[in-house]
Amino acid sequence: MKNISYNQAIEILRNYNTILIDVQTESDYEKKHMINSINVPVEEINRKITNMVKDKNQIIIVYCLKGIRSVAAYDMLKRLGYNNVYNIQGGIDS
């Protein structure tokens, strides 16, 4: 698993074409999220991501509040064949 810190995520976002996916529920996303993130609840990753991200080499960063749901989302994305997936370890509350 490619775990990164919040600060490392910010650097990647500044320097590379990156998709930032918040995997919290919609209600949690409305309470707290990173700017320019896309909300795709973890339960919807398998159904939605292949239509959203066609390039399997696209850099994708996943996160949630505590870093639990994002681990599941990371695993799903890897199983779907995405190669450049990163997880913000501990979530945005870390």
Task: Give the role of each language-model region.
Residues 33-35, 81:
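Short, structured coil segments at secondary-structure junctions
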Residues 3, 20, 37-39, 85-87:
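Conserved beta-strand scaffold positions in the cores of enzyme catalytic domains, especially
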Residues 33, 49, 89:
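Short, flexible helix/strand-to-coil boundary loops that buttress conserved ligand/catalytic motifs
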Residues 52-94:
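Catalytic cysteine-centered active loop of the rhodanese-like fold, especially the PTP/DSP P-loop
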Residues 1-31:
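Flexible, polar/low-complexity N-terminal or interdomain linker segments that lie immediately upstream
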Residues 36-61:
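Helix-loop module immediately N-terminal to the HCX5R catalytic loop
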